[in-house]
Amino acid sequence: MSAGTHCGPPGNRAPPFARLCCVSAALGMLWSPACLAFNLDVDKLTVYSGPEGSYFGYSLDFYIPDARTASVLVGAPKANTSQPDIVEGGAVYYCPWPSERSAQCKQIPFDTTNNRKIRVNGTKEPIEFKSNQWFGATVRAHKGKVVACAPLYHWRTLKPNPAKDPVGTCYVAIQNFSAYAEHSPCRNSNADPEGQGYCQAGFSLDFYKNGDLIVGGPGSFYWQGQVITVSIADIIANYSFKDILRKLAAEKQTDVAPASYDDSYLGYSVAAGEFTGDSQQELVAGIPRGAQNFGYVSIINSTDMTFIQNFTGEQMASYFGYTVVVSDVNNDGMDDILVGAPLFMEREFESNPREVGQVYLYLQASALLFQDPQVLTGTETFGRFGSSVAHLGDLNQDGYNDIAIGVPFAGKDQRGKVLIYNGNPRGLHSKPSQVLQGIWGSQTIPSGFGFSLRGDADIDKNDYPDLLVGAFGKGKVAVYRARPVVTVDAQLLLHPMIINLENKTCQIPEFPTPVACFSVRVCASIAGQSISNTIALLAEVQLDFLKQKGAIKRTLFLHNHQSHFTFPFVMKQQKSLHCQDFMVYLRDETEFRDKLSPINISLNYSLDDSTFKDSLEVKPILNHYRDNVVTEQAHILVDCGEDNLCVPDLKLSARPDKHQIIIGDENHLMLIINARNEGEGAYEAELFVIIPEEADYVGIERNNKGLRPLSCEYKMENVTRMVVCDLGNPMVTGTNFSLGLRFAVPRLEKTNMSINFDLQIRSSNKDNPDSNFERVQINITAIAQVEIRGVSHPPQIVLPIHNWEPEKKPHKEEEVGPLVEHIYELHNIGPSTISDSILDVGWPFSARDEFLLYIFHLQTLGPLQCQTNPEINPQDIKPAASPEDTPELSAFLRNATIPHLVRKRDVPVVQLHRQSPARILNCTNIDCLQISCAVGRLGGGESAVLKVRSRLWAHTFLKRKNDHYALASLVSFEVKKMPYKEQPAKLPAGSTAVKTSVIWATPNVSFSIPLWVIILAILLGLLVLAILTLALWKCGFFDRARPPQDEMTDREQLTSDKTPEA
């Protein structure tokens, strides 16, 4: 029996009652129940209430003196009574069953007297102290006998300097509470802590099966503790109100032990059971602080009170032995022991241990031989799992005893919980079958729901044991009644179990087309203790239930064309088989593909609650440990031999139409796949092609007569992309065909040397369903064609320049010489991209400290970063505004292909000299300025352009008249890197020269003619012409001879038809 909070004065050793304190105010964590309710009824709950603050419910028991009478006993150790001058002496309440509003719980008058007194020096002084004695902290009933104790009862010792010692006392009630007797086994002359002065007799309490009493006194002998047994008959026979110090001859007690056993608390909990193989019970006592605070439980011989066997806890300060209970859990005829350790700490993480509590079950294998314990562990921090453990009896009538475990400070607002564990042949189920939730909160102390438990009694006479749960912090006791358990034995019978789609023997109403069908028979029988003769179930049959939601159900009920049907199923006699038949048909073959997987049919059932009237009786419940779902399978007949099992032999091969693709290219490729079946039919055969992340599915090849145009679709499962092609249902024996799948591969920048397509044929066949795994590897390469080209603008300079002379020390750009621009273009033809290149220019800058082409500005287009060595414009000449580009130059800068950037212009005023070839000036014979450019990323078809604006240093060349020169700049490039994981073995490089010619021309000589000379010449010319004309006229040069004319006009001659006469 679990204990409560006790207080009292300290002795000359450590204070005892602080160590015996068991009420905790620690916070509990929320705990979610592991399962649904089983057969303790939580709806028709009976609740008894006691006075506020009385700790009503701290202890409790059933009181069943005979087969016709049942009631509940409840201890309230802080209740006030009618005893004069006694404050919170405590009481035990009698609560009648069945509970009615008019029937209140009443105090049982175990003791109605004040403190007894003695005369000391002429003054009456109390010899006992009943205030705050915690009467009712323990209460036990055995048939018609009831014992209740006050472990904090004090008495005045018979010493010269008397002390007030908490010896504890108990009261016995018999004959339906008509006779009472007190027994205080530790109230004697052996006082003080070293004796039995701090005994606290009645701290724990139990009965042997013969009715003898076991009393625990954990404070005796410097809190070594002790256990006392006594016969109820001896207590009654030898009781005398006046005889305070009374020793019963038949009383048995454990003796004092060596000092090393101090502070052990023997008797903290007690129970009785049979463990030696004889017919006489032994007692079991918890010693939670023994064994160096590890705690242990002892089996003690009931005859001579000697210790027989110990069970030791596994963790220090876990309070192993806080509770002990005896029960034959596995129904093998031998008693088993359960031990609570509510302060056990789970050390999954050493830095953050959790106090969760444990309960240990020791199954007895033979006399004094026990199996290794089964351990149940709590889940809620500070819930105090194992503070109370109760033997319930066979709660669900399955032949094995069940156990309740209290977790009084668990759950929401520390409302408490009670966990029900059912027994089985191996012990207890590891998961609770039911979790009772505390329903009372408290703003002061926790309600303590589950701190006290009592079972193994049938209060409502329905042949099922019931459970009492106390919540002392709220002053409540709840009666949970067990519901009758109905065990259903159900089955599904299918005929035939193999369906021939060609055998269409059923007719759908209102449809002329026959269909293939089979029958479904639902049969069930019921069994259970004390259940009604008529039990109604609500049953549901689901056809093809493993098909996912939204998928086509292959079978339907003939009467409603649905894949499920719910119906009432009434059974009127236990163990009698009841059946009901249904016809089921298959859809047309064109409506579904799956012919191989079984047609799974399920029957699930529940009790039809509508048939149970709302009465005081508790409703039955289905057996928690019997599955309420029954399944069966039917199969479709396939052409797979006598065994109806198809074993295909699928083969697969594949090859690409190209074995290499280039990064940056369009990269269209086709996989040519051959699929064949050399075995039996493969059902729902499909080709799966896993698409690499670099590729995209384009479609199936339909223009090649040698390739079959199958039905294929793109799918995505999670992050896997695939193409799935239907190969037939079934893919029959001897199938052999090829198909082509087209893909585009645009994303190759981050890939390795190759990409892989994974292929496999899969079917729904059970045996050998898949083909070989095929992997097609495509190699990846990077190729970039890069060219460098340049142009000079203008391509030649003609000296001298008309009406212009250079300055010896120019200050402006225009004073230097004619403009010369060189433009260089680095062009990536592709298809791959280049990401890191170098462009170098050697520029004809000077010779013998004389400038040649003097640079003023560098202009770039595209990803270019340039620097020069030495710096440009070293004379710090003021540059001119940048001139606008000519159309030819603009086109060049737009990457246009220009055959002739600059046309050859006419020179009407000068004649070009052709006497000698030009002398070439380049970096091999002059001083060059170096231009170095870093080129960034260039994709296929992209360019980078460098434009160098300079002036011909005219002064240098005018000193060398008639010498022809060609000024050449040399531009080169080298690709350093491409933006891919794998680099090609050789990267592009190249160079070219750009020339500007300097040539000379000699001007024509022209004479100046006076104006009067020109006028005189014109007049003289006119005079000569006039004289000549006059001479010719005089000579008759202008006269003409004409033929003779008649009177006929020209028109008449032209229109006359006659020939003129001679």
Curated annotation (Swiss-Prot):
One cellular component (GO) term of this entry: cell surface
Main location: membrane
SMART domains documented for this protein: Int_alpha
Glycosylation sites: 80, 121, 176, 238, 301, 310, 503, 600, 604, 718, 736, 752, 779, 895, 922, 1004
Ranges of the FG-GAP repeats in the UniProt entry: 41-104, 121-182, 187-239, 252-305, 306-371, 372-430, 434-497
Entry keywords, A to Z: Calcium, Cell adhesion, Cell membrane, Cleavage on pair of basic residues, Developmental protein, Differentiation, Disulfide bond, Glycoprotein, Integrin, Membrane, Metal-binding, Neurogenesis, Receptor, Repeat, Signal, Transmembrane, Transmembrane helix
Positions that bind Ca(2+) 2: 328, 330, 332, 336
Binding site for Ca(2+) 3: 394, 396, 398, 400, 402
Extracellular side: 36-1010
Short sequence motif Cell attachment site: positions: 454-456
Residues that coordinate or bind Ca(2+) 1: 274, 276, 278, 282
Keyword Metal-binding: yes
Family affiliation: Belongs to the integrin alpha chain family.
Protein name: Integrin alpha-8
Organism: Mus musculus (Mouse)
Lineage: Eukaryota, Metazoa, Chordata, Craniata, Vertebrata
